[in-house]
A protein has these predicted regions:
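Conserved short alpha-helical segments that host acidic/polar catalytic motifs at enzyme active sites
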Residues: 1-167, 173-230, 236
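A structural signal for short secondary-structure junctions
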Residues: 165-166, 249, 291-294, 319-320
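Extended, hydrophobic alpha-helical segments in both membrane/secreted and soluble proteins
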Residues: 233, 240-247, 251, 255, ...
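Short, glycine/charge-rich flexible loops or terminal/linker lids adjacent to PRPP-binding catalytic cores
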Residues: 252-298, 308-312
Length: 320
């Protein structure tokens, strides 16, 4: 079964597969939710036929693209008229004599970061974390099976336990029988702190640290050290809630759900490609509850730490 989708602006991931769930058969597979290009793609090369998915930010993509074109290579996959960066990465991989050599070529050539999963013809999955460790890969295990993911929150309901976290630049091969290390990890780690502060799902763990625990503890410390006079703490959903709960406990004030998020119509506000639509989604998905707001001195923990769109767009409502 092969399916490639890309647009998740108006509907969620599962709905894209509702009519085809009965086609999901077999015992091995890879997939990804990408905000850059349709994935996975399938490559036929001297290394054999393989499927690949990537999480990448390639700063020098145009430079590598020009060099590959000068070597008479071509790009069959396009994303919004631009080169599909996953295909570009696959072309770097097939320059190696083995998958490991090819992935190391990616590490050398790419300025930025790139983590990936490769599904080979023999049914094994090669997992490679970017050389700086900026994006995570977590290995899970249960009886007779192994899995790799960027979000450990996907494991509990599938009965997987966290087995290990791949280190920066580490490469492993997974089968149903076990995990084989193909490349040792680098010593230097530069993981993205936004995973705990903003992007991560509350039940996920990165490098052994739980997302909700980090948010709650951050809020707790703020509450213990803040001398502001407030009646209650409120969190802008989603990531602001954990911090506000911690603040409330540290400050010794109640937590009030003064703003709720309506998600059936308005999904995540950073998903749309245009800033105008992102701003609209950010504004429309949050609904204030006046009964919990009026006459109170409120302390809000915001959810949007880049542009501050979530709380800023609701300030007028709060004052009214």
């Amino acid at each position: 079964f092969i399916r490639s989708i890309h647009n998740l602006e108006s509907t969620y991931f599962r709905t894209k597969f509702e009519d085809e769930l009965d086609k999901f058969k077999g015992n091995v597979g890879i997939g990804i939710i990408s905000d850059t290009d349709p994935q996975p793609i399938i490559i036929n090369s001297h290394l054999g036929r393989f499927a690949i998915v990537t999480v990448a930010k390639i700063v020098n993509l145009e430079e590598i693209e020009a060099e590959l074109l000068s070597q008479n290579m071509h790009f069959a996959e396009l994303s919004s008229g631009n080169t599909n960066q996953t295909e570009l990465i696959s072309l770097l991989i097939i320059q190696g004599k083995t998958f490991v050599e090819g992935i190391e070529n990616v590490y050398r050539r790419v300025k930025g970061s790139c983590s990936m999963l490769l599904l080979s013809e023999d049914g094994s999955i090669i997992a490679a974390r970017d050389k700086w460790g900026r994006t995570p890969i977590v290995i899970g295990r249960k009886e007779g099976a192994y899995a790799a993911t960027s979000e450990s929150s996907s494991f509990p309901n599938l009965d997987y336990e966290i087995d290990r976290y791949l280190g920066p630049g580490e490469i492993v091969r997974m089968t149903a029988d076990g995990v084989e290390q193909l490349r040792k990890p680098e010593e230097k780690m530069q993981i993205c702190s936004f995973l705990w502060v903003y992007y991560g799902f509350p039940t996920s763990c990165y490098e052994g640290r739980n997302v909700e625990e980090v948010r709650f503890t951050s809020g707790l410390k703020m509450g213990q050290n803040d001398d502001s006079e407030v009646d209650c703490a409120c969190g802008i959903p989603d990531s602001g809630v954990g911090m506000a709960l911690g603040y409330a406990e540290g400050k010794g004030v109640p937590y009030h759900r003064a703003i709720s998020k309506y998600t059936p119509t308005w999904p995540r506000s950073f998903t749309p490609s245009k800033q105008e639509m992102r701003s609209l989604v950010a504004k429309m998905k949050l609904i204030p509850n006046r009964a919990m707001l009026e006459g109170k001195r409120l302390l809000f923990c915001d959810d949007s730490i880049v542009r501050g769109t979530q709380l800023r767009d609701n300030v007028k409502v709060l004052y009214e």
